[in-house]
Amino acid sequence: MPSGSSESPADALRASDSTPDIKPRSRDVTDGLEKTAARGMLRAVGMGDDDWVKPQIGVGSSWNEITPCNMSLQRLAQSVKGGVHSAGGFPLEFGTISVSDGISMGHEGMHFSLVSREVIADSVETVVQAERLDGTVLLAGCDKSIPGMLMAAARLDLASVFLYNGSIMPGVAKLTDGSEREVTIIDAFEAVGACARGLMSREDVDIIERAICPGEGACGGMYTANTMASAAEALGMSLPGSASPVAIDKRRDEYARRSGEAVVEMLRRGITARDILTKEAFENAIAVVMAFGGSTNAVLHLLAIAWEANVKLTLEDFTRVGQKVPHLADVKPFGRHVMKHVDEIGGVPVVMKALLDAGLMHGDCLTVTGETMAENLAHIEPPDPDGKVLRAMNNPIHPTGGITILHGSLAPEGAVVKSAGFDSDVFEGTARVFERERAALDALEDGTITHGDVVVIRYEGPKGGPGMREMLAITGAIKGAGLGKDVLLMTDGRFSGGTTGLCVGHIAPEAVDGGPIAFVRDGDRIRLDVAKGTLDLLVDEAEFESRKAGFEPLPPVYTTGVLAKYTKLVGSAAVGAVCG
Protein backbone atom coordinates (compact mmCIF):
# COMPACT_ATOMS: atom_id res chain seq x y z
CA MET A 1 0.00 0.00 0.00
CA PRO A 2 2.84 2.53 0.56
CA SER A 3 2.99 4.82 -2.44
CA GLY A 4 6.72 5.37 -2.58
CA SER A 5 6.24 9.14 -2.84
CA SER A 6 9.20 11.45 -2.41
CA GLU A 7 9.29 13.75 0.62
CA SER A 8 6.96 12.94 3.50
CA PRO A 9 5.31 15.62 5.69
CA ALA A 10 7.68 14.62 8.51
CA ASP A 11 10.73 15.09 6.28
CA ALA A 12 9.45 18.46 5.05
CA LEU A 13 8.97 19.76 8.60
CA ARG A 14 12.40 18.58 9.68
CA ALA A 15 13.99 20.29 6.70
CA SER A 16 12.41 23.64 7.55
CA ASP A 17 14.80 26.16 9.10
CA SER A 18 12.11 28.63 10.16
CA THR A 19 11.17 29.09 13.82
CA PRO A 20 7.41 28.70 14.32
CA ASP A 21 5.44 31.21 16.36
CA ILE A 22 4.22 29.32 19.42
CA LYS A 23 1.49 31.96 19.92
CA PRO A 24 0.10 32.15 16.39
CA ARG A 25 -3.35 33.33 17.53
CA SER A 26 -3.51 34.21 21.22
CA ARG A 27 -1.56 37.42 20.67
CA ASP A 28 -4.93 38.70 19.49
CA VAL A 29 -6.07 38.68 23.14
CA THR A 30 -2.83 39.22 25.09
CA ASP A 31 -0.70 41.81 23.29
CA GLY A 32 -1.10 45.57 23.15
CA LEU A 33 -2.90 48.40 24.88
CA GLU A 34 -6.20 47.68 23.20
CA LYS A 35 -6.28 44.17 24.74
CA THR A 36 -6.48 45.51 28.30
CA ALA A 37 -10.04 44.26 28.81
CA ALA A 38 -9.22 40.80 27.45
CA ARG A 39 -6.20 40.51 29.74
CA GLY A 40 -8.37 41.56 32.66
CA MET A 41 -10.77 38.72 31.91
CA LEU A 42 -7.90 36.25 31.62
CA ARG A 43 -6.41 37.41 34.95
CA ALA A 44 -9.72 36.41 36.55
CA VAL A 45 -9.27 32.79 35.38
CA GLY A 46 -5.73 32.54 36.71
CA MET A 47 -3.37 34.08 34.17
CA GLY A 48 -0.73 36.58 35.26
CA ASP A 49 2.09 38.73 33.92
CA ASP A 50 4.37 35.76 33.29
CA ASP A 51 1.72 33.94 31.26
CA TRP A 52 1.21 36.37 28.37
CA VAL A 53 4.15 34.88 26.47
CA LYS A 54 2.77 31.34 26.76
CA PRO A 55 0.68 29.61 24.10
CA GLN A 56 -2.94 29.19 25.15
CA ILE A 57 -4.15 25.61 24.81
CA GLY A 58 -7.82 24.75 24.75
CA VAL A 59 -8.61 21.57 26.67
CA GLY A 60 -11.96 20.63 25.17
CA SER A 61 -13.92 17.84 26.82
CA SER A 62 -17.26 16.10 26.33
CA TRP A 63 -17.41 15.17 30.03
CA ASN A 64 -20.87 14.65 31.48
CA GLU A 65 -22.69 12.56 34.07
CA ILE A 66 -25.35 11.17 31.72
CA THR A 67 -23.33 8.21 30.48
CA PRO A 68 -20.37 6.19 31.79
CA CYS A 69 -18.56 6.71 28.49
CA ASN A 70 -17.31 10.19 29.42
CA MET A 71 -17.03 10.07 33.19
CA SER A 72 -13.22 9.80 33.31
CA LEU A 73 -12.71 12.91 31.21
CA GLN A 74 -12.96 15.35 34.11
CA ARG A 75 -10.05 13.58 35.82
CA LEU A 76 -8.05 13.24 32.62
CA ALA A 77 -8.47 16.92 31.77
CA GLN A 78 -6.64 17.80 34.99
CA SER A 79 -3.68 15.68 33.91
CA VAL A 80 -3.74 17.23 30.44
CA LYS A 81 -3.58 20.69 31.98
CA GLY A 82 -0.65 19.64 34.13
CA GLY A 83 1.18 18.50 31.02
CA VAL A 84 0.47 21.78 29.23
CA HIS A 85 1.79 23.76 32.20
CA SER A 86 4.96 21.67 32.48
CA ALA A 87 5.67 22.13 28.77
CA GLY A 88 5.38 25.92 28.97
CA GLY A 89 1.81 26.50 27.82
CA PHE A 90 -1.30 27.76 29.57
CA PRO A 91 -4.36 25.46 29.48
CA LEU A 92 -7.92 26.74 29.31
CA GLU A 93 -10.59 24.08 29.77
CA PHE A 94 -14.01 24.17 28.10
CA GLY A 95 -16.83 21.70 27.57
CA THR A 96 -19.10 20.48 24.83
CA ILE A 97 -22.00 18.04 24.56
CA SER A 98 -22.18 14.29 24.09
CA VAL A 99 -25.14 12.00 23.36
CA SER A 100 -25.28 8.47 24.74
CA ASP A 101 -26.34 6.10 21.97
CA GLY A 102 -26.94 3.35 24.52
CA ILE A 103 -29.58 5.47 26.24
CA SER A 104 -31.05 7.10 23.13
CA MET A 105 -31.36 3.83 21.17
CA GLY A 106 -34.72 2.64 19.87
CA HIS A 107 -36.79 5.80 20.38
CA GLU A 108 -37.06 9.41 19.26
CA GLY A 109 -33.80 10.33 20.96
CA MET A 110 -31.74 8.45 18.37
CA HIS A 111 -32.68 11.09 15.77
CA PHE A 112 -30.36 13.42 17.68
CA SER A 113 -27.30 11.16 17.84
CA LEU A 114 -25.56 11.80 14.52
CA VAL A 115 -26.41 15.50 14.55
CA SER A 116 -24.50 15.71 17.85
CA ARG A 117 -21.32 14.98 15.87
CA GLU A 118 -21.85 18.20 13.91
CA VAL A 119 -22.82 20.17 17.03
CA ILE A 120 -19.63 19.04 18.76
CA ALA A 121 -17.43 20.01 15.81
CA ASP A 122 -19.21 23.35 15.45
CA SER A 123 -19.06 24.15 19.17
CA VAL A 124 -15.34 23.39 19.43
CA GLU A 125 -14.66 25.50 16.35
CA THR A 126 -16.74 28.33 17.83
CA VAL A 127 -14.87 28.43 21.15
CA VAL A 128 -11.39 28.02 19.67
CA GLN A 129 -11.95 30.66 16.99
CA ALA A 130 -13.64 33.15 19.30
CA GLU A 131 -11.05 32.88 22.07
CA ARG A 132 -8.06 32.70 19.67
CA LEU A 133 -6.60 29.57 21.25
CA ASP A 134 -3.29 28.41 19.78
CA GLY A 135 -3.84 24.67 20.03
CA THR A 136 -6.12 22.05 21.51
CA VAL A 137 -6.20 18.78 23.36
CA LEU A 138 -9.62 17.29 22.66
CA LEU A 139 -11.02 14.63 25.00
CA ALA A 140 -13.95 12.34 24.22
CA GLY A 141 -15.30 8.91 25.04
CA CYS A 142 -18.45 8.23 23.05
CA ASP A 143 -19.47 7.20 19.55
CA LYS A 144 -20.14 10.66 18.05
CA SER A 145 -17.96 12.77 20.31
CA ILE A 146 -14.77 11.13 19.01
CA PRO A 147 -15.37 11.91 15.32
CA GLY A 148 -16.85 15.28 16.27
CA MET A 149 -13.62 16.23 18.03
CA LEU A 150 -11.48 14.95 15.15
CA MET A 151 -13.63 16.87 12.66
CA ALA A 152 -13.06 20.03 14.69
CA ALA A 153 -9.31 19.42 14.76
CA ALA A 154 -9.25 18.91 11.00
CA ARG A 155 -11.38 22.00 10.35
CA LEU A 156 -9.34 24.29 12.61
CA ASP A 157 -5.94 22.98 11.43
CA LEU A 158 -4.10 23.93 14.61
CA ALA A 159 -1.73 21.96 16.79
CA SER A 160 -4.11 19.37 18.19
CA VAL A 161 -4.00 16.06 20.09
CA PHE A 162 -6.94 13.73 20.66
CA LEU A 163 -7.29 11.80 23.94
CA TYR A 164 -9.75 8.94 24.44
CA ASN A 165 -11.59 8.30 27.70
CA GLY A 166 -10.98 4.55 27.51
CA SER A 167 -13.41 1.66 27.50
CA ILE A 168 -15.39 -0.02 30.25
CA MET A 169 -14.44 -3.30 31.88
CA PRO A 170 -16.58 -6.28 30.87
CA GLY A 171 -19.33 -7.19 33.31
CA VAL A 172 -20.00 -10.67 34.66
CA ALA A 173 -23.54 -12.08 34.68
CA LYS A 174 -24.40 -15.13 36.80
CA LEU A 175 -27.57 -16.48 35.20
CA THR A 176 -30.30 -18.54 36.82
CA ASP A 177 -29.11 -21.78 35.19
CA GLY A 178 -25.82 -21.45 37.07
CA SER A 179 -23.81 -20.32 34.05
CA GLU A 180 -21.54 -17.31 34.20
CA ARG A 181 -20.40 -15.14 31.30
CA GLU A 182 -18.82 -11.82 30.49
CA VAL A 183 -21.35 -9.34 29.13
CA THR A 184 -21.41 -5.93 27.46
CA ILE A 185 -24.26 -3.55 26.71
CA ILE A 186 -24.99 -5.41 23.46
CA ASP A 187 -26.04 -8.44 25.50
CA ALA A 188 -28.87 -6.34 26.92
CA PHE A 189 -30.32 -5.53 23.50
CA GLU A 190 -30.11 -9.19 22.49
CA ALA A 191 -31.65 -10.30 25.78
CA VAL A 192 -34.72 -8.18 25.03
CA GLY A 193 -35.29 -10.05 21.76
CA ALA A 194 -34.73 -13.40 23.42
CA CYS A 195 -37.17 -12.57 26.20
CA ALA A 196 -39.81 -11.36 23.73
CA ARG A 197 -39.64 -14.75 21.98
CA GLY A 198 -39.79 -16.68 25.25
CA LEU A 199 -36.15 -17.77 25.00
CA MET A 200 -34.99 -15.99 28.16
CA SER A 201 -36.62 -15.24 31.50
CA ARG A 202 -37.21 -11.72 32.78
CA GLU A 203 -35.06 -12.64 35.76
CA ASP A 204 -32.06 -13.34 33.52
CA VAL A 205 -32.70 -10.12 31.59
CA ASP A 206 -32.58 -8.25 34.90
CA ILE A 207 -29.31 -9.98 35.85
CA ILE A 208 -27.76 -8.94 32.54
CA GLU A 209 -29.04 -5.37 32.93
CA ARG A 210 -27.30 -5.07 36.29
CA ALA A 211 -24.02 -6.53 35.01
CA ILE A 212 -23.39 -4.85 31.65
CA CYS A 213 -21.89 -1.58 32.93
CA PRO A 214 -19.72 -2.23 36.00
CA GLY A 215 -18.17 1.25 35.97
CA GLU A 216 -16.98 4.12 33.81
CA GLY A 217 -15.80 3.88 30.24
CA ALA A 218 -17.07 3.42 26.70
CA CYS A 219 -18.75 0.22 25.50
CA GLY A 220 -16.10 -2.47 25.69
CA GLY A 221 -16.21 -4.35 22.39
CA MET A 222 -14.89 -3.18 19.04
CA TYR A 223 -17.99 -1.07 18.72
CA THR A 224 -17.99 2.49 17.39
CA ALA A 225 -16.16 4.25 20.23
CA ASN A 226 -13.27 1.78 20.37
CA THR A 227 -13.16 1.58 16.58
CA MET A 228 -12.85 5.35 16.28
CA ALA A 229 -10.31 5.56 19.12
CA SER A 230 -8.22 2.96 17.27
CA ALA A 231 -8.67 4.93 14.05
CA ALA A 232 -7.54 8.13 15.79
CA GLU A 233 -4.36 6.39 16.91
CA ALA A 234 -3.79 5.02 13.41
CA LEU A 235 -4.36 8.49 11.93
CA GLY A 236 -1.56 9.77 14.16
CA MET A 237 -3.83 12.14 16.10
CA SER A 238 -3.41 10.30 19.43
CA LEU A 239 -0.32 9.21 21.30
CA PRO A 240 0.76 5.69 20.32
CA GLY A 241 -0.71 3.05 22.61
CA SER A 242 -3.33 5.36 24.09
CA ALA A 243 -6.48 3.84 22.57
CA SER A 244 -6.60 0.49 24.35
CA PRO A 245 -6.15 0.92 28.15
CA VAL A 246 -9.49 0.81 29.95
CA ALA A 247 -10.93 3.95 31.51
CA ILE A 248 -9.98 3.06 35.08
CA ASP A 249 -6.35 2.28 34.16
CA LYS A 250 -4.03 4.90 35.70
CA ARG A 251 -1.88 4.77 32.55
CA ARG A 252 -4.57 7.01 31.10
CA ASP A 253 -3.49 9.83 33.42
CA GLU A 254 0.04 9.54 32.08
CA TYR A 255 -1.22 9.57 28.48
CA ALA A 256 -3.22 12.68 29.42
CA ARG A 257 -0.19 14.46 30.85
CA ARG A 258 1.90 13.55 27.81
CA SER A 259 -0.88 14.73 25.48
CA GLY A 260 -0.69 18.15 27.13
CA GLU A 261 3.06 18.21 26.64
CA ALA A 262 2.77 16.99 23.05
CA VAL A 263 0.50 19.80 21.88
CA VAL A 264 2.95 22.45 23.10
CA GLU A 265 5.78 20.63 21.35
CA MET A 266 3.69 20.57 18.16
CA LEU A 267 3.48 24.36 18.35
CA ARG A 268 7.23 24.60 18.76
CA ARG A 269 7.70 22.44 15.67
CA GLY A 270 4.97 24.13 13.67
CA ILE A 271 2.93 20.93 13.28
CA THR A 272 -0.80 21.27 12.67
CA ALA A 273 -3.60 18.74 12.26
CA ARG A 274 -3.57 18.74 8.47
CA ASP A 275 0.15 17.93 8.45
CA ILE A 276 -0.95 14.66 10.07
CA LEU A 277 -4.32 14.10 8.38
CA THR A 278 -3.07 13.20 4.91
CA LYS A 279 -4.61 10.76 2.44
CA GLU A 280 -2.02 8.19 3.50
CA ALA A 281 -2.96 8.64 7.17
CA PHE A 282 -6.59 7.92 6.33
CA GLU A 283 -5.53 4.79 4.48
CA ASN A 284 -3.68 3.73 7.64
CA ALA A 285 -6.84 4.27 9.68
CA ILE A 286 -8.94 2.29 7.20
CA ALA A 287 -6.41 -0.55 7.36
CA VAL A 288 -6.62 -0.73 11.16
CA VAL A 289 -10.43 -0.62 11.10
CA MET A 290 -10.48 -3.44 8.54
CA ALA A 291 -8.03 -5.57 10.54
CA PHE A 292 -10.12 -5.14 13.68
CA GLY A 293 -13.41 -5.83 11.87
CA GLY A 294 -14.54 -2.52 13.35
CA SER A 295 -17.78 -0.59 13.24
CA THR A 296 -19.36 0.35 9.91
CA ASN A 297 -19.81 3.82 11.42
CA ALA A 298 -16.08 4.30 10.87
CA VAL A 299 -16.83 4.60 7.15
CA LEU A 300 -19.21 7.49 7.76
CA HIS A 301 -16.93 9.21 10.26
CA LEU A 302 -13.63 8.86 8.40
CA LEU A 303 -15.29 10.29 5.28
CA ALA A 304 -16.47 13.25 7.37
CA ILE A 305 -13.10 13.86 9.04
CA ALA A 306 -11.37 13.68 5.66
CA TRP A 307 -13.87 16.18 4.24
CA GLU A 308 -12.99 18.61 7.04
CA ALA A 309 -9.27 18.04 6.38
CA ASN A 310 -9.76 18.76 2.67
CA VAL A 311 -8.65 15.21 1.82
CA LYS A 312 -10.42 13.43 -1.03
CA LEU A 313 -11.55 10.14 0.51
CA THR A 314 -14.24 7.98 -1.12
CA LEU A 315 -15.99 4.66 -0.62
CA GLU A 316 -13.71 3.24 -3.31
CA ASP A 317 -10.73 3.84 -0.99
CA PHE A 318 -12.35 1.60 1.63
CA THR A 319 -12.84 -1.11 -1.00
CA ARG A 320 -9.26 -0.79 -2.27
CA VAL A 321 -7.68 -0.98 1.18
CA GLY A 322 -10.11 -3.61 2.46
CA GLN A 323 -9.26 -5.98 -0.38
CA LYS A 324 -5.63 -6.05 0.77
CA VAL A 325 -5.97 -6.03 4.56
CA PRO A 326 -7.02 -9.24 6.37
CA HIS A 327 -9.44 -9.37 9.28
CA LEU A 328 -7.26 -10.32 12.28
CA ALA A 329 -9.08 -9.49 15.51
CA ASP A 330 -11.36 -11.93 17.34
CA VAL A 331 -13.27 -9.17 19.08
CA LYS A 332 -16.89 -8.43 19.88
CA PRO A 333 -19.49 -8.05 18.49
CA PHE A 334 -18.67 -11.05 16.27
CA GLY A 335 -15.72 -12.42 18.23
CA ARG A 336 -15.01 -13.33 21.83
CA HIS A 337 -12.88 -10.49 23.20
CA VAL A 338 -13.17 -6.84 24.23
CA MET A 339 -10.77 -3.89 24.24
CA LYS A 340 -9.40 -4.87 27.65
CA HIS A 341 -8.08 -8.07 26.07
CA VAL A 342 -6.62 -6.15 23.11
CA ASP A 343 -4.74 -4.00 25.62
CA GLU A 344 -3.43 -7.04 27.46
CA ILE A 345 -1.66 -8.31 24.34
CA GLY A 346 -0.13 -4.95 23.40
CA GLY A 347 -2.95 -2.78 22.10
CA VAL A 348 -3.46 -1.10 18.75
CA PRO A 349 0.32 -0.89 18.06
CA VAL A 350 0.39 -4.70 17.69
CA VAL A 351 -2.02 -4.48 14.75
CA MET A 352 -0.24 -1.48 13.28
CA LYS A 353 3.17 -3.15 13.40
CA ALA A 354 1.82 -6.35 11.84
CA LEU A 355 0.28 -4.33 9.01
CA LEU A 356 3.39 -2.17 8.60
CA ASP A 357 5.66 -5.22 8.41
CA ALA A 358 3.37 -6.64 5.73
CA GLY A 359 3.60 -3.46 3.66
CA LEU A 360 -0.02 -2.55 4.34
CA MET A 361 0.53 0.80 6.10
CA HIS A 362 2.38 4.01 5.33
CA GLY A 363 5.17 4.19 7.89
CA ASP A 364 6.26 7.70 6.91
CA CYS A 365 3.08 9.44 8.09
CA LEU A 366 3.64 12.18 10.65
CA THR A 367 2.01 11.88 14.09
CA VAL A 368 1.37 14.10 17.11
CA THR A 369 4.66 12.95 18.63
CA GLY A 370 6.50 14.81 15.87
CA GLU A 371 7.80 11.48 14.65
CA THR A 372 6.49 9.11 12.01
CA MET A 373 4.25 6.16 12.63
CA ALA A 374 7.14 3.79 11.89
CA GLU A 375 9.41 5.63 14.33
CA ASN A 376 6.75 5.48 17.04
CA LEU A 377 6.37 1.73 16.59
CA ALA A 378 10.14 1.25 16.67
CA HIS A 379 10.24 2.99 20.07
CA ILE A 380 7.37 0.91 21.47
CA GLU A 381 8.55 -2.41 20.02
CA PRO A 382 5.08 -3.99 20.24
CA PRO A 383 4.92 -7.78 20.39
CA ASP A 384 3.68 -9.99 17.59
CA PRO A 385 -0.03 -10.91 17.52
CA ASP A 386 -0.83 -13.42 20.26
CA GLY A 387 -2.78 -15.74 17.94
CA LYS A 388 -5.99 -15.63 19.99
CA VAL A 389 -7.17 -12.05 20.40
CA LEU A 390 -5.20 -11.02 17.31
CA ARG A 391 -4.38 -13.55 14.63
CA ALA A 392 -1.13 -13.58 12.69
CA MET A 393 -1.11 -12.23 9.14
CA ASN A 394 -0.76 -15.74 7.73
CA ASN A 395 -3.74 -17.04 9.73
CA PRO A 396 -6.49 -14.41 9.46
CA ILE A 397 -10.13 -14.80 10.41
CA HIS A 398 -10.99 -13.58 6.91
CA PRO A 399 -8.55 -12.88 4.07
CA THR A 400 -10.02 -9.42 3.48
CA GLY A 401 -11.19 -6.61 5.76
CA GLY A 402 -14.23 -6.88 7.99
CA ILE A 403 -16.22 -4.17 6.17
CA THR A 404 -17.41 -4.36 2.54
CA ILE A 405 -18.67 -1.52 0.36
CA LEU A 406 -21.61 -2.47 -1.87
CA HIS A 407 -23.03 -1.07 -5.09
CA GLY A 408 -25.86 -2.25 -7.32
CA SER A 409 -29.38 -1.44 -8.42
CA LEU A 410 -30.46 -0.84 -4.81
CA ALA A 411 -27.40 1.25 -3.91
CA PRO A 412 -26.12 3.22 -6.90
CA GLU A 413 -24.08 5.55 -4.65
CA GLY A 414 -23.09 2.79 -2.25
CA ALA A 415 -23.95 0.88 0.91
CA VAL A 416 -21.96 -0.69 3.73
CA VAL A 417 -22.05 -4.18 5.22
CA LYS A 418 -20.05 -5.62 8.12
CA SER A 419 -18.91 -8.72 6.28
CA ALA A 420 -17.02 -9.98 9.34
CA GLY A 421 -20.29 -11.55 10.49
CA PHE A 422 -21.21 -13.41 7.30
CA ASP A 423 -20.85 -17.18 7.05
CA SER A 424 -21.75 -17.22 3.33
CA ASP A 425 -21.34 -14.65 0.60
CA VAL A 426 -24.84 -14.70 -0.88
CA PHE A 427 -28.25 -14.02 0.64
CA GLU A 428 -31.39 -13.88 -1.48
CA GLY A 429 -34.78 -13.34 0.07
CA THR A 430 -38.19 -11.72 0.02
CA ALA A 431 -38.68 -8.06 0.89
CA ARG A 432 -40.68 -7.01 3.93
CA VAL A 433 -40.91 -3.22 3.70
CA PHE A 434 -41.31 -0.89 6.68
CA GLU A 435 -41.46 2.88 6.90
CA ARG A 436 -39.06 3.56 9.75
CA GLU A 437 -37.81 1.29 12.53
CA ARG A 438 -40.82 1.12 14.86
CA ALA A 439 -42.98 -0.69 12.30
CA ALA A 440 -40.29 -3.36 11.88
CA LEU A 441 -40.01 -3.85 15.65
CA ASP A 442 -43.76 -4.32 15.88
CA ALA A 443 -43.66 -6.99 13.15
CA LEU A 444 -40.84 -8.82 14.91
CA GLU A 445 -42.70 -8.76 18.21
CA ASP A 446 -45.80 -10.10 16.42
CA GLY A 447 -43.77 -13.00 15.04
CA THR A 448 -44.47 -12.10 11.41
CA ILE A 449 -40.81 -11.75 10.38
CA THR A 450 -39.56 -15.19 9.38
CA HIS A 451 -36.62 -17.08 7.89
CA GLY A 452 -35.61 -15.81 4.46
CA ASP A 453 -37.09 -12.34 4.85
CA VAL A 454 -35.24 -9.19 3.80
CA VAL A 455 -36.37 -6.53 6.25
CA VAL A 456 -36.27 -3.18 4.42
CA ILE A 457 -36.38 -0.16 6.76
CA ARG A 458 -36.47 3.12 4.88
CA TYR A 459 -36.86 6.82 5.61
CA GLU A 460 -34.13 6.48 8.22
CA GLY A 461 -31.38 8.22 6.21
CA PRO A 462 -29.50 11.40 7.19
CA LYS A 463 -32.20 13.64 5.71
CA GLY A 464 -35.27 11.40 5.79
CA GLY A 465 -34.92 10.11 9.35
CA PRO A 466 -33.71 12.64 10.05
CA GLY A 467 -30.43 11.80 11.73
CA MET A 468 -29.73 8.36 10.25
CA ARG A 469 -30.71 6.44 13.37
CA GLU A 470 -28.85 3.31 14.42
CA MET A 471 -30.90 0.11 14.17
CA LEU A 472 -29.50 -1.70 17.21
CA ALA A 473 -32.90 -2.23 18.80
CA ILE A 474 -34.19 -4.19 15.81
CA THR A 475 -30.94 -6.03 15.04
CA GLY A 476 -30.48 -7.01 18.67
CA ALA A 477 -34.07 -8.23 18.79
CA ILE A 478 -33.62 -10.22 15.56
CA LYS A 479 -30.55 -11.96 16.96
CA GLY A 480 -32.20 -12.52 20.31
CA ALA A 481 -35.14 -14.13 18.51
CA GLY A 482 -32.78 -16.64 16.89
CA LEU A 483 -33.04 -15.14 13.40
CA GLY A 484 -29.62 -13.50 13.19
CA LYS A 485 -28.37 -15.81 10.42
CA ASP A 486 -31.70 -16.15 8.61
CA VAL A 487 -32.97 -12.59 8.12
CA LEU A 488 -31.25 -9.81 6.16
CA LEU A 489 -31.88 -6.25 7.28
CA MET A 490 -31.20 -3.35 4.92
CA THR A 491 -31.74 0.35 5.52
CA ASP A 492 -30.79 3.87 4.53
CA GLY A 493 -30.10 4.33 8.24
CA ARG A 494 -27.11 3.11 10.25
CA PHE A 495 -26.19 0.30 12.57
CA SER A 496 -24.57 0.37 15.96
CA GLY A 497 -20.96 -0.71 16.22
CA GLY A 498 -22.36 -3.50 18.38
CA THR A 499 -24.72 -4.79 15.71
CA THR A 500 -24.41 -8.42 14.68
CA GLY A 501 -26.22 -10.40 12.02
CA LEU A 502 -26.86 -9.83 8.33
CA CYS A 503 -27.14 -6.06 8.06
CA VAL A 504 -26.69 -3.61 5.18
CA GLY A 505 -26.77 0.10 5.97
CA HIS A 506 -25.93 3.55 4.60
CA ILE A 507 -27.89 2.76 1.40
CA ALA A 508 -27.56 5.75 -0.90
CA PRO A 509 -29.37 7.58 -2.34
CA GLU A 510 -31.77 7.45 0.60
CA ALA A 511 -35.53 7.05 0.27
CA VAL A 512 -36.42 10.69 0.81
CA ASP A 513 -34.20 11.61 -2.16
CA GLY A 514 -35.96 9.10 -4.41
CA GLY A 515 -33.30 6.41 -4.12
CA PRO A 516 -34.21 2.90 -5.31
CA ILE A 517 -34.97 1.81 -1.74
CA ALA A 518 -38.05 4.08 -1.90
CA PHE A 519 -39.62 1.87 -4.58
CA VAL A 520 -39.12 -1.59 -3.06
CA ARG A 521 -42.40 -3.42 -2.38
CA ASP A 522 -43.39 -6.35 -0.19
CA GLY A 523 -42.67 -9.60 -2.00
CA ASP A 524 -39.83 -8.28 -4.18
CA ARG A 525 -36.75 -10.50 -4.37
CA ILE A 526 -33.48 -8.96 -3.19
CA ARG A 527 -30.00 -10.41 -3.66
CA LEU A 528 -26.87 -9.57 -1.68
CA ASP A 529 -23.51 -10.88 -2.91
CA VAL A 530 -20.78 -9.88 -0.47
CA ALA A 531 -17.96 -11.41 -2.53
CA LYS A 532 -18.97 -9.38 -5.59
CA GLY A 533 -19.90 -6.32 -3.53
CA THR A 534 -23.40 -6.08 -5.01
CA LEU A 535 -26.89 -5.37 -3.68
CA ASP A 536 -29.66 -5.75 -6.25
CA LEU A 537 -33.43 -5.61 -6.53
CA LEU A 538 -34.54 -8.49 -8.76
CA VAL A 539 -37.42 -6.65 -10.41
CA ASP A 540 -38.03 -6.08 -14.11
CA GLU A 541 -36.65 -2.68 -15.13
CA ALA A 542 -39.90 -1.54 -16.74
CA GLU A 543 -41.87 -2.49 -13.63
CA PHE A 544 -39.37 -0.69 -11.42
CA GLU A 545 -39.49 2.50 -13.53
CA SER A 546 -43.30 2.47 -13.44
CA ARG A 547 -43.21 2.67 -9.65
CA LYS A 548 -41.51 6.07 -9.79
CA ALA A 549 -44.51 7.79 -11.34
CA GLY A 550 -45.93 10.45 -9.03
CA PHE A 551 -43.37 9.75 -6.28
CA GLU A 552 -43.86 11.80 -3.14
CA PRO A 553 -41.51 11.21 -0.21
CA LEU A 554 -42.80 11.08 3.32
CA PRO A 555 -43.08 14.59 4.78
CA PRO A 556 -40.39 15.79 7.21
CA VAL A 557 -40.84 14.72 10.81
CA TYR A 558 -39.33 17.91 12.24
CA THR A 559 -40.11 21.39 10.96
CA THR A 560 -38.48 23.38 13.77
CA GLY A 561 -35.37 23.05 15.90
CA VAL A 562 -31.97 21.57 15.27
CA LEU A 563 -33.22 18.61 13.24
CA ALA A 564 -35.12 20.89 10.87
CA LYS A 565 -31.88 22.78 10.22
CA TYR A 566 -29.97 19.51 9.90
CA THR A 567 -32.45 18.18 7.32
CA LYS A 568 -31.81 21.20 5.10
CA LEU A 569 -28.01 20.94 5.30
CA VAL A 570 -27.02 17.28 5.56
CA GLY A 571 -25.59 15.40 2.59
CA SER A 572 -25.53 11.77 1.50
CA ALA A 573 -24.16 8.97 3.65
CA ALA A 574 -21.93 8.14 0.67
CA VAL A 575 -19.87 11.25 1.45
CA GLY A 576 -20.02 11.07 5.25
CA ALA A 577 -23.38 12.76 5.95
CA VAL A 578 -21.60 16.08 6.41
CA CYS A 579 -23.32 19.45 6.59
CA GLY A 580 -21.45 21.38 3.94
UniProtKB/Swiss-Prot annotation:
GO terms for molecular function: 2 iron, 2 sulfur cluster binding; dihydroxy-acid dehydratase activity; magnesium ion binding. Keywords: 2Fe-2S, Amino-acid biosynthesis, Branched-chain amino acid biosynthesis, Iron, Iron-sulfur, Lyase, Magnesium, Metal-binding. Residues 20-31 have a biased composition (Basic and acidic residues). Its cofactor is [2Fe-2S] cluster; Mg(2+). Pathway: Amino-acid biosynthesis; L-isoleucine biosynthesis; L-isoleucine from 2-oxobutanoate: step 3/4; Amino-acid biosynthesis; L-valine biosynthesis; L-valine from pyruvate: step 3/4. Gene3D superfamilies: IlvD/EDD C-terminal domain-like (3.50.30.80). Signal peptide: none annotated. The active site is at residue 496. It is an enzyme of class 4 (lyase). Its EC number is 4.2.1.9. The modification N6-carboxylysine is found at residue 144. Homodimer. Functions in the biosynthesis of branched-chain amino acids. Catalyzes the dehydration of (2R,3R)-2,3-dihydroxy-3-methylpentanoate (2,3-dihydroxy-3-methylvalerate) into 2-oxo-3-methylpentanoate (2-oxo-3-methylvalerate) and of (2R)-2,3-dihydroxy-3-methylbutanoate (2,3-dihydroxyisovalerate) into 2-oxo-3-methylbutanoate (2-oxoisovalerate), the penultimate precursor to L-isoleucine and L-valine, respectively. NCBIfam families: ilvD, PRK00911.1. Belongs to the IlvD/Edd family. This is Dihydroxy-acid dehydratase. The gene is ilvD.
